[in-house]
């Protein structure tokens, strides 16, 4: 998902797992409609909070600012949700976490606290933490925008590997090369609406939207 700041990309992601409540329209997760209703004040709210909690476990989210628990080690961050939300036995959760930390290339830092990691390392821990819940889909909200330029590549490599495994991922990003090479579909938002939508080869080489052409040329220049 591409678009200028304020175009609605992050809001869209946050509506999928109801971190923000949509005011109109419908949200389906894996074909299942999230049921909504109006409360007594006329606000749109979930009809069944248990449904929302269940569906949230199917969506892993990786944030721009990592959102790791600072008082926990890397390993503790990764096992926290499986143990306390999914009731996975601790020894089983640790075994899976160790495997995931190897996968994202940060197993040697498993006993470190986040403050002692670089931004790229913290974001790879955040990806491992999201994967630990075995979600059907991963949501990435500008996962590299808070990183120093030299650290971006290590995170994109992990994300590319996940895409090659066939994982369903919705990625909000300004990394044009990554979007072009890795995605199966590109959506460009403008002022909350879809301005361009299609396969990357088509969108990047022959866009129908003049706004997207301007957006793309501006980012390629930088």
Predicted segment positions?
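Conserved ABC ATPase signature
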Residues: 113-117, 121
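ABC ATPase "signature
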Residues: 197-198
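Conserved ABC transporter NBD signature motif
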Residues: 25-40
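A short, proline-enriched helix->beta-strand linker immediately N-terminal to the Walker B motif
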Residues: 132-136
């Amino acid at each position: 998902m591409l678009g200028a700041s304020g175009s609605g990309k992050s809001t869209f992601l946050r509506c999928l797992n109801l971190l923000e409540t949509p005011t109109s329209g419908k949200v389906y997760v894996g074909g299942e409609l999230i049921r909504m209703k109006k409360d007594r004040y006329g606000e749109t709210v979930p009809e069944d909070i248990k449904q929302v909690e269940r569906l949230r476990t199917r969506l892993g989210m990786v944030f721009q600012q990592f959102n790791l628990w600072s008082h926990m080690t890397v390993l503790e961050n990764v096992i926290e949700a499986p143990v306390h939300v999914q009731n996975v036995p601790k020894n089983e959760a640790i075994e899976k976490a160790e495997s995931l930390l190897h996968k994202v290339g940060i197993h040697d830092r498993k006993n470190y606290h986040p403050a002692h990691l670089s931004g790229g390392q913290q974001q790879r821990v955040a990806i491992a933490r999201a994967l630990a819940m075995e979600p059907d889909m991963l949501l990435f909200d500008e996962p590299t925008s808070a990183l120093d330029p030299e650290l971006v590549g290590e995170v994109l490599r992990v994300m590319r590997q996940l895409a090659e495994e066939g994982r369903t991922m919705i990625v909000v990003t300004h990394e044009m090369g990554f979007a072009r090479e890795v995605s199966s579909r590109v959506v460009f938002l403008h002022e909350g609406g879809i301005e361009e939508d299609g396969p990357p080869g088509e969108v990047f080489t022959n866009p129908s939207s003049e706004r997207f052409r301007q957006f793309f040329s501006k980012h390629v220049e930088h």
